[in-house]
Amino acid sequence: MKHLAALIAGLLLTAGCGPKAITVGSRPFPAARPVFSDASGKALEALPAADGTIRLVFLEFPWCPACADVWRAVGISAKPFPQGTVRVYRVLFDRETVLTPDGRKEVPPLRPAPLPEGDGPEDPLALKVTTLTALPVEFREEFRVSQGPVVLLLDAEGTVERRWIGFSAGMSRELSSEIMKRARVLSPRPPGT
């Protein structure tokens, strides 16, 4: 009995160790250490400022067949709202796991990630997209993400309010509904901005 109690105590002490799951109600960013890099290569532990917009975090993985569908759903859901209502943090992973005769290996993506649709300067309804790259070792040691793609809806303080894993046919409708709820709370922008 004494050994069982010691085992349970040991398991409870180590239960908080290791990568955390990004769950609804958690506040993953800022992380304890840098887990992203921006376009300039600067390491970041937090998402860049979002100027009061509705924030979505899109964890996009290499060889992700559903990622194009998720991008389409995000674009469709944000289209009815004024430009700048939604900011998407696109987090790319620059490593993928491949199976080789020697076992599993982490390698750079075998093909580059395509740019999301509707992210061009010529598109007047373009989403505000900030692209970041996950630092492979640091992100994996800080967070546990077992499958993707993942879309997180954050509140103003950075707490995860909703999480979607994978793609579903009703995703754009769900996202649009969540944006609508939050867009009512946002103060109207002054004319001409």
Residue ranges with predicted function:
Residues 190-193:
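Short, solvent-exposed mixed-charge patches
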Residues 32, 54-55, 148-150:
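Short loop/turn microsegments at loop-to-beta-strand junctions
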Residues 17-47:
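N-terminal "domain-start" segment that seeds a small globular fold
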Residues 5-15:
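Bacterial N-terminal signal peptides
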Residues 125, 135-176:
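Thiol/disulfide oxidoreductase modules built on the thioredoxin-like
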Residues 1-3:
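Positively charged n-region of N-terminal signal peptides that target proteins for export
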Residues 48-68:
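Short active-site neighborhood of thiol/selenol oxidoreductases, capturing the structured segment around
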Residues 68-123, 136-140:
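Structural microenvironment flanking redox-active thiols in thiol-disulfide oxidoreductases
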